[in-house]
Design a protein with these regions (language model features):
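Extracellular mucin-like/proteoglycan-style low-complexity regions
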Residues: 1-56
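Extracellular trypsin-like serine protease catalytic domains
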Residues: 58, 152, 156-166, 179-185, ...
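Disulfide-braced loops of extracellular cysteine-rich modules
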Residues: 61-69, 103-111, 327
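Small-residue (G/S/T/A) turn/hinge positions that recur once per unit in extracellular repeat modules
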Residues: 70-72, 111-113, 192
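A conserved glycine-rich beta-strand in the N-terminal activation segment of trypsin-fold
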Residues: 184-197, 250
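Conserved H-D interstitial segment of serine endopeptidase catalytic domains
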Residues: 200-203, 208-245, 269, 273, ...
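Serine endopeptidase catalytic core focused on the charge-relay Asp
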Residues: 248-272, 284-295
């Protein structure tokens, strides 16, 4: 410690050594200490007078009443501190905390959906199957199997383990309950995501040949492809919708909506993933760094298909960074505004062929939402390449409109984009 008692201060000259009586002393020529007793210089011996307060040289920093909205001021050396009422904050208590309650700021504190009001403030809302609680921000389920929840974890009060497919891990049975598998004549075609009891979303490029939808089967509740585990529900497909602007062989608008011939039954192992509101997806979910991708795709490039459902956490990548990376490789498709990138450049973890159409699921405040569809990439976990996903937020209106449309047409149908 310094001579002023502050740690880290610059040391002053050494203090004189104490003599036998604890008083300052001097060293004689023989080296022995000789006590010295004399009054302090410049002051007569006797009791010390009380120190006279020295007027502050910098003046009263609170004299100008800098604290607003009822804040109280405390003068400091060359500065001041405002103590604000509960509803205000800021250096001068200038900010009403209610003004910070806007959706762009931490989702307005809402657990699910947030709406700003023109007159100021915001209100929270909940997805279908949930209801807003008395606190005005929390959402509680109103149905046995609400979307975006994982019953096998909820019932054991667990938390979804952080999975890290190529370089991935097995998704434990029931922990990816919205995962669908699309098969043609029993062979794996693509992955998919359950959005509602009769609706599954996948990738348009899975249906490049007529055969792929004529003999198409969708299975929910699947985990191990080698075994019948009793949780599987198999359905035929009545119709497949793809965007009218999708061009076969191209990568833009790579999304397909499948209507099952009859609804599945929700169980602990079959639960839909929430299709989020567009603004919530673009403003809030897009800022979540890691999301989970799952599927039975090849474990290695041109390798064997996984027999158990795999899952992997991938970080979202800035679109500009992905576009720059893609331009370095001749022949790579253009990354458009209808796509986003995620993954690692070191080739360690990626979605792979056979995972096409599967979910890119994002968790926010305990509920999972569909944010992407596995679309394309350069090989599997190829170095210097990210995985590319269909940006679901661009198609939410299209999906909702189709899910609310009744049609007797069957087969592969082109549906106009809004």
């Amino acid at each position: 410690r310094s001579q002023h008692g502050f740690p880290g201060g610059r040391a002053g000259p050494p203090l004189p050594s104490p003599g036998p009586a604890g008083l300052p002393g001097h060293r004689s020529s023989s080296g022995a200490l000789t006590p010295v007793s004399r009054p302090a210089r410049g002051r007569p011996a006797g009791p010390s007078p009380a120190p006279t307060p020295r007027p502050s040289a910098d003046g009263d920093q609170c004299a100008s009443n800098p604290c607003r909205n009822g804040g109280s001021c405390e003068d400091q050396l060359g500065s001041y501190i405002c103590f604000c009422p509960d509803s205000f904050q800021g250096r001068n208590c200038e900010t009403n905390k209610k003004d910070l309650l806007v959706c762009v700021n931490e989702n307005g504190g809402c657990e699910q959906y947030c709406s700003d009001h023109a007159e100021g403030g915001r209100s929270c809302r909940c997805h279908e199957g949930y209801t807003l609680q008395d606190d005005g921000v929390s959402c509680a389920p109103t149905v046995e199997y609400p979307c975006g929840k994982i019953p096998v974890l909820e019932k054991r009060n667990g938390s979804n383990p952080q999975g890290r497919i190529v370089g991935g891990r097995v998704c434990p049975k029931g922990e990816c309950p919205w995962q669908a598998i699309l098969t043609v004549d029993g062979a794996l075609l693509c992955g998919g995501t359950l959005l509602d009891a009769a609706w599954v979303v996948s990738a348009a490029h899975c249906f490049k040949t007529r055969k792929n939808w004529r003999n198409l089967t969708v299975v929910l509740g699947e985990h191990d492809l080698r075994e019948q585990e009793g949780e599987e529900q198999e359905r035929r497909v009545a119709r497949v919708f793809i965007p009218d602007k999708y061009v076969p062989g191209k990568t833009n608008h790579d999304i397909a909506l499948l209507q099952l011939n009859r609804p599945v039954t929700f169980t602990d192992h079959v639960v839909p993933l929430c299709l989020p509101e567009k603004s919530f997806s673009e403003r809030t979910l897009a800022s979540v760094r890691f999301s989970t991708v799952s599927g039975w795709g090849q474990l290695l490039h041109r390798g064997a298909t996984a027999v158990q459902l795999m899952a992997i956490d991938v970080p979202r990548v800035m679109t500009q960074d992905c576009q720059e990376q893609s331009r370095r490789w001749e022949g790579s498709p253009t990354v458009t505004e209808n796509m986003f990138c995620a993954g690692y450049l070191d080739g360690s973890k990626d979605a792979c062929q056979g995972d096409s159409g599967g979910p890119h699921a994002t968790k926010f405040q305990g509920t999972w939402y569909l944010t992407g569809i596995v679309s394309w990439g350069e090989g599997c976990a190829a170095e210097d390449h990210f995985g590319v996903y269909t940006r679901v937020s661009r198609y939410i209106e299209w999906l909702r409109r189709l899910m609310n449309t009744n049609t007797t047409l069957r087969g592969l149908l082109r549906a106009p984009l809004p």
